[in-house]
């Protein structure tokens, strides 16, 4: 008689038959994400953004699991390797403030009071940040982006 093959066990790691065991149909957390394997062999892997944030664009890491297939009284174990590829994560820019007297110019240059400073982050390990735009449309003055991490803000009284 023909029997249907089903997945009967799932474990973390690449050594067949060993590693932390999971439950079929429930999530098993690996290093870079969570794997859910169903008895029929279908599976879903959800990458953990926080775990993969430090990857640069194109960098790859793997999450490895092993599973057991049962058909009747026969079993076999195999390894499933999931490759996680880094992407260019968006930086997180924090608001900055400055003050200037009317008619004067506020200059922020590279140094301890950069527009780009310790409160602005990019999770990619080797990314560097730069100012690409300054939001305009204020009611009290205008701003101009300068070189990396610098800006000039000239305020003038508007009628």
Residue ranges and their predicted role:
Residues 21-86, 142-159:
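Acidic, turn/loop-rich segments in luminal/extracellular domains of secretory-pathway
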């Amino acid at each position: 008689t023909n029997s249907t093959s089903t997945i009967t066990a799932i474990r973390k790691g690449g050594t067949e038959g060993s590693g932390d065991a999971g439950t079929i149909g429930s999530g098993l957390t690996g290093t870079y994400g969570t794997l859910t394997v169903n008895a029929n062999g279908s599976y879903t892997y959800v990458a953990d953004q926080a775990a993969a944030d430090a990857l640069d664009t194109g960098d790859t890491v793997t999450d490895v699991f092993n599973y057991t297939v049962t058909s009747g009284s026969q079993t076999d174990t195999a390894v499933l390797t999931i490759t996680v590829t880094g992407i260019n994560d968006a930086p997180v820019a924090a608001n900055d403030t400055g003050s200037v007297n009317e008619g004067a110019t506020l200059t922020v240059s590279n140094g301890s009071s950069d527009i780009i400073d310790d409160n602005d982050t990019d999770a990619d390990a080797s990314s560097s940040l730069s100012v690409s735009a300054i939001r305009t449309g204020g009611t009290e003055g205008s701003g101009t982006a300068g070189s990396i991490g610098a800006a000039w803000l000239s305020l003038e009284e508007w009628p």
